[in-house]
Amino acid sequence: MSRAMTKRVHKALTDENLQTALTRLLGLIKFVRQIAFTGLDFESLSHEIRRIKEDSIANLPQLVEQFKSQATKAGVVVYEAEDADDANKYVLKLAQERKVKHIVKSKSMLGEEIELREHLEKAGIEVTETDIGEWIVQLAGERPAHLVGPAIHKTIEQVAELISKATGQELGTDPQALLDAARRALRQTYIDADMGISGANIAIAETGTLVVVTNEGNGCMATTLPSVHVAVVGYEKIVSSWKDAAAIFRLLSRCTAGMKMPVYISHITGPGRTDAIPGAMLHGAGGPDEVHIVLVDNGRWQMRETDEFREALYCIKCGACLNVCPVFASVAGQVYGYIYQGGIGAILTAFLHSVDEAEEVASLCLGCMACKEACPARIDIPQMITRLRASLAQEKGLPLLNRIAYGSILKHQPRLDRVIRIGSHLQQPFVDADLMIRRLPGPLNALTQTISLPALSHRPLRDRLKDYSSPKLTDKPKVAFYAGCVAAYAYPEIGEDVMKVLKECGAEPYYPAGQACCGAPAYFAGDVETALSLAKTNIAALEEMKPDCIVTVCPGCAAVLQREYLSLTSAEPRWNQRARALAGKIRDFSQLVLELTPSAGEKPSRNQKVTYHDPCHLKRGIGVYSEPRQLLQREGFEVLEMADSDACCGFGGHVVLSYPELSKSVLKRKLDNIEATGAETVITNCIPCILQLRGGLDKRHSHIKVMHSAELLAKSF
């Protein structure tokens, strides 16, 4: 976190035009995306794209040579640029040699990456962006806010003002009239242009063909009307065959704009001819006299050599991750990004630009995993963000406060207990009668302006369950209860309810005394050493009594126990084997209750309406979605589905502490959706989500209750 980023976040959140634009457009994108994916097997198609990209990057040296050979045979001049400066110099030199005065440019994120337009303009060459969105941000003097929707952050009123000024006409806000005016203004630029510049969505090695996808036709004109066409292409865009390209097309436009297929697909194989029919060259079909392809490295080969970050090269730049990202929905890509936006942008920025810029961008990630779920190449962006933070922590060191918090306190459970006990006494002047903290002093008040906080318990769960530190010798299923820090110290009564319900369900639950923090705060901040130490502590504590299963009430903890411990112990085979055995025993509370009572019948209606919030780490982290609903319905509750039930509540990552104003923005959307259901109670099987939702609803003076399903069931027994 930096003061500069905090200011940028605040500016975005208080920009009425930006907030209006994001609300309008992202809602529309979500709607059309649902339509476009209806009846489509996203799982199998995304697995196919993943395979194609894995194979392409693995075989990239050979594919590059094949592409260069085939493109050269087709009459293309291929130049390999080491970095941005090398690429820019080549294009500028070519333009100067051809006495180019006017250039039309089709959309290219690589062009943005290397700042090609700015480089050419400094040399006195006029460059016009021809993608409508890119043209709008060019007129505004800004950078794109989205990988495929550059002007998504602009309202229609702002767009009308920009186009009116550019064309000298007084235009209203009718979209078609604005498009017509833009087309008229841009049409002459194609005719006047001496050079066209494009990127490429795909480069096909077997024929040396570039594939350019657009929705406006500007790509066709920019690559055919001028006498010289220059394409700047990242090496990662190269695939083996036309078949591979076709597979990518199946999802590309659905993910970008909710369209089943792109409006225009240009296949470019050399100058003055086209490959409209694969394998059948049509000569004399018009087009440029010269085609130059600039293959750009700029850090890509280095990225390919890293096991931790190679999969960032699988990105097809569709923007699906941005369309579902709660942080992007609040501040857009000019805050949550450098050149490339979002979580994937943070990874790309680390290699293509600067680790300092990447660190700033990564600090905004909530870790909700919505991006991973939406990605057509199945890229694990959250995991790469975690690796980036670990790499930065190793390279630059952790801030002093983090080192103390993680290495000196969190790592040692007795110390953490003492600190919490001290805190439970120091908090007293700020605790209201209902055990809520609504105002903290000094800088900490930024947090209580967002949510009301629960008071720390004077009797943490460890003290309350001293008599349950080991299971009794019975034939009942032995269930180890892993509570997590928030339940243990802020909501111990929920832990007691868990024990009560599990006993009623015929289990023998116990609370292993040796359990410690799962290590998530340290792990996701990059402190791998502390996280590994805590992993070993918990593995030893939880496996000691040989439980049949391990129940959790915090999905974040469950995901760490189930998945991250495998990663943390990967270099130590014996510990990794123990972690793997542990992972197979992890159960969410609702899962376990259904397993323990499979034959329980449905109870009569309680005439109580509830809605359910899907915690990010429960649904996307460990794959539990239907079980909580099944349990609630079986117990006689009427479940009213809220809109975007699986959208993040804003608690995740370090955002709630580092950027409370951003967390509040994400939370607002969730609370609005909860209230819209008319439910009396919102249920969620995540303790941190309970903290966030209760705190947010309290600030609204709402009468809606927030409960864990264990609390609800305990009251019915």
Question: Whereabouts are the PLM-identified features?
Answer:
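Iron-sulfur cluster-binding cysteine motifs and their immediate structural context
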Residues: 320-347, 364, 370-391, 560-562, ...
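Active-site lining segments that contact anionic ligands and/or coordinate catalytic metals
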Residues: 228, 264, 288-291, 310, ...
